[in-house]
């Protein structure tokens, strides 16, 4: 399905979200450094964990609100609110005021607004795109996000430290403009029947709404197929989240200075730090260039085996890293790692939309994100594991988690196929 054939709302979002994501990634990668300098590493770490907890809660509420009030209303409200949060962030770093405490509050609010935005954005795609094309569309949005992730920090490395107030003010303006763009140039995609169903519900007041939400998420987690999907995702996250955890630490300790190319009498050498930068660029370049191509290729195969072999390749990439200290082997391992990532990036989002009833799509997407949020909380344990077991065993254990996730996916599809046959 070509972009020109998309619903107008998705075209508007694709452009607007690219600029929003690019500006966001000019700020986000440098916040850990900023808060560590202002509060100290220990307190900064605790504050970032607290911020993450608020974002998880907001994400779950975002799913409920997207199903209850509609996709468009949530997207507009979250984008504008995020703009005001960044405006507060800018004020806390302005010529008139310098307040790290207010900066943390503003950052937390901005993160919560982003978490409110995400479930509605995913559900909107599932609302308007036929099932057979959803993987392609999710892949295109993923590609633009990763281009933003590559471009944003390049500018942010200069702007965040030298022109922080101006940068944060710009991000605030872009967020509000995105909200206005969504307000006037997108349409509501949640069906009128579903909205009417919510209006006829029995929940009254905020207590009733909260009880209804808890009940709905309870129903979702009783879905054994979906629960296995989340469990497999948490296991797999222990591998792919090592890109900015154990992998850079290993490279730094393994490569002192190594010649990677000798051409016409000139040598090119890398250190552990520069080698990680090259591998990160490799990952970003492959994602930017090949996400849509690989996603379309993978749709030709059964989802069960795509999920399974993606998990095996993640495990293989982890096994390759400790085998050597040669940079080019690391380069190959990163290619395997990235290919495994791209095999499932569109298919998994499409699979969630197939599991979710139309009236609960937002909540399903929100609950599915638990595989990342819980995985992100557990993944840093890999760092002390290197002290307990050494790098070799740490990589083997991480790779084993990935392989185990593959077998969980097989069990999940066994139950899914049984359910599908029973519903025929």
From Swiss-Prot:
InterPro entries named in the record: MFS, MFS_dom, MFS_trans_sf, MFS_Transporters, Sugar_transporter_CS
Membrane topology qualifier: Multi-pass membrane protein
Gene Ontology cellular-component annotations: plasma membrane
GO molecular function: antiporter activity
GO BP annotation list: potassium ion transport; response to antibiotic; sodium ion transport
Cited Pfam families: MFS_1 (PF07690)
Record family assignment: Belongs to the major facilitator superfamily.
Function: Exhibits dual functions as a Na(+)(Li(+)/K(+))/H(+) antiporter and a multidrug efflux pump. Catalyzes the efflux of Na(+), Li(+) and K(+) in exchange for external protons. Shows a preference for Na(+), followed by K(+) and Li(+). Can also function as a multidrug efflux pump. Transports ethidium bromide and norfloxacin.
Protein's UniProt name: Na(+), Li(+), K(+)/H(+) antiporter
Species of the source: Planococcus maritimus
Gene designation: mdrP
């Amino acid at each position: 399905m070509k972009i020109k054939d998309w619903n107008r709302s998705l075209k508007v979002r694709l452009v607007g979200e690219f600029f929003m994501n690019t500006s966001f990634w000019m700020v986000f990668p440098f916040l850990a450094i900023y808060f560590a300098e202002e509060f100290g590493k220990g307190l900064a770490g605790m504050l970032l964990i607290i911020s993450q907890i608020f974002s998880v809660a907001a994400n779950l509420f975002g799913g409920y609100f997207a199903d209850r009030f509609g996709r468009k209303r949530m997207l507009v409200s979250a984008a504008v609110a995020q703009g005001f949060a960044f405006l507060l962030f800018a004020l806390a770093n302005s010529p008139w005021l310098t307040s790290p405490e207010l900066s943390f509050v503003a950052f937390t609010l901005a993160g919560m607004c982003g978490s409110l935005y995400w479930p509605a954005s995913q559900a909107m795609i599932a609302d308007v795109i036929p099932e057979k094309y959803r993987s392609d569309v999710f892949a295109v949005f993923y590609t633009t996000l990763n281009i933003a992730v590559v471009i944003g920090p390049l500018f942010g490395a200069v702007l965040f430290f030298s022109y922080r107030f101006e940068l944060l003010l710009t991000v605030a303006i872009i967020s509000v403009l995105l909200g206005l763009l969504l307000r006037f140039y997108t349409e509501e995609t949640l069906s009128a029947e579903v909205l009417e169903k919510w209006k006829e519900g029995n929940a009254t007041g905020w207590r009733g709404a909260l009880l209804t939400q808890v009940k709905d998420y309870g129903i979702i987690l009783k879905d054994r197929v979906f629960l296995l999907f989340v469990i497999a995702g948490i296991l797999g996250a222990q591998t792919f989240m090592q890109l900015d955890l154990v992998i850079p630490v290993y490279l730094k300790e393994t490569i002192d200075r190594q010649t990677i190319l000798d051409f016409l009498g000139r040598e090119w050498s890398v250190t552990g730090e520069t080698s990680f930068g090259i591998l990160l660029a490799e990952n970003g370049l492959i994602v930017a260039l090949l996400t849509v191509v690989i996603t379309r290729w993978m749709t030709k195969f059964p989802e069960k085996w795509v999920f399974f072999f993606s998990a095996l390749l993640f495990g293989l990439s982890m096994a390759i890293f400790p085998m050597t200290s040669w940079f080019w082997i690391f380069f190959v391992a990163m290619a395997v790692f990235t290919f495994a990532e791209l095999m499932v990036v569109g298919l998994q989002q499409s699979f969630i939309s197939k599991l979710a009833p139309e009236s609960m799509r937002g909540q399903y997407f929100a609950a599915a994100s638990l595989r990342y949020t819980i995985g992100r909380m557990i993944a840093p344990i890999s760092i002390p594991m290197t002290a307990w077991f050494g790098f070799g065993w740490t990589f083997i254990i991480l790779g084993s988690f990935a392989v185990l996730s593959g077998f969980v996916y097989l069990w999940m599809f066994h139950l899914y196929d049984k359910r599908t046959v029973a519903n025929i």
